[in-house]
Swiss-Prot record:
Organism of origin: Zea mays
GO terms of biological process kind: intracellular iron ion homeostasis; iron ion transport
Binding site for Fe cation 2: E133, E182, Q216
Enzyme Commission identifier(s): 1.16.3.1
Lineage: Eukaryota, Viridiplantae, Streptophyta, Embryophyta, Tracheophyta
Protein name (record): Ferritin-2, chloroplastic
PROSITE patterns in UniProt: FERRITIN_1, FERRITIN_LIKE
Transit peptide (first-last residue): 1-43
InterPro entries xrefs: Ferritin (IPR001519), Ferritin-like (IPR012347), Ferritin-like_diiron (IPR009040), Ferritin-like_SF (IPR009078), Ferritin_CS (IPR014034), Ferritin_DPS_dom (IPR008331)
Designated gene of the protein: FER2
Entry's Gene Ontology cellular component terms: chloroplast; cytoplasm
Function of the molecule: Stores iron in a soluble, non-toxic, readily available form. Important for iron homeostasis. Has ferroxidase activity. Iron is taken up in the ferrous form and deposited as ferric hydroxides after oxidation.
Catalytic EC class: oxidoreductase
Alphabetically ordered keywords of this record: Chloroplast, Iron, Iron storage, Metal-binding, Oxidoreductase, Plastid, Transit peptide
């Protein structure tokens, strides 16, 4: 027969104290957990701060190499950067091409503006073409200066002054000359683009493509249609006169 021993008052007190300790440990555990979360958050924040403040680009260190390249001589360009001599020379050549084309168109303008030719529409077309080619030359000159190059103008060849043709007449012959000249200018632009590509100059490549090549293609297409139309109307008479009137009324 087993006797059930009841807890002594001391044991009861101990149990009570033990229960009280357990009761008090729960809030302590929560507090500890909360502290752990706070510490984790702080650690994460510290880690993030470490990543954000990680040194990747040190401008004042890396700039030392570029600073040494800034020219001190007053006769040298301060803006020039990654612009080689071949590109500079090719741009000067293209400037000369554009000025020669402008000069040729100006001669055509003078011919058709004569009192004994008197095709005012053709004169207007060639005057506008001359102005456009000159603007192209000036645009190239501005770009040359912007990149730190030096503009060196070259000689311009004296153009033809007479454009009458025994078989084709002056109107068709002049427009065929124009088509050939536009294609030649386009070839020169492609050559300039090739130099820029070979020299790995993406800025010059973008400039040629965005400012010249698309417009040049449109000009070739436009003049091609003029040649086709003039071949249909014949080289003299009312057909040429009506074509001249169309050019006179056409917007630039």
């Amino acid at each position: 027969m087993m006797l059930r021993v009841s807890s002594s008052p001391a044991a009861a007190v101990a149990n009570h104290l033990s229960g009280g300790a357990a009761a008090t440990t729960a809030p302590a555990r929560v507090t500890a957990q909360r502290s752990g979360v706070s510490l984790s958050a702080a650690a994460a924040a510290g880690k993030g701060k470490e990543v954000l403040s990680g040194v990747v680009f040190q401008p004042f260190e890396e700039i030392k190499g570029e600073l040494a390249l800034v020219p001190q001589s007053p006769d040298r360009s301060l803006a020039r950067h990654k612009f080689v001599d071949d590109c500079e020379a090719a741009i000067n050549e293209q400037i000369n091409v554009e000025y020669n084309a402008s000069y040729a168109y100006h001669s055509l303008f003078a011919y058709f503006d004569r009192d004994n030719v008197a095709l005012k529409g053709f004169a207007k077309f060639f005057k506008e073409s001359s102005d456009e080619e000159r603007e192209h030359a000036e645009k190239l000159m501005e770009y040359q200066n912007k990149r730190g190059g030096r503009v060196r103008l070259q000689s311009i060849v004296a153009p033809l002054t007479e454009f009458d043709h025994p078989e084709k007449g002056d109107a068709l012959y002049a427009m065929e000359l124009t088509l050939a000249l536009e294609k030649l200018v386009n070839e020169k632009l492609h050559s300039l683009h090739g130099v820029a590509t070979r020299c790995n100059d993406p800025q010059l490549i973008d400039f040629i493509e965005s400012e010249f090549l698309e417009e040049q293609g449109e000009a070739i297409n436009k003049v091609s249609k003029y040649v086709a139309q003039l071949r249909r109307v014949g080289n003299k008479g009312h057909g040429v006169w009506h074509f001249d009137q169309m050019l006179l009324q056409e917007a630039a």
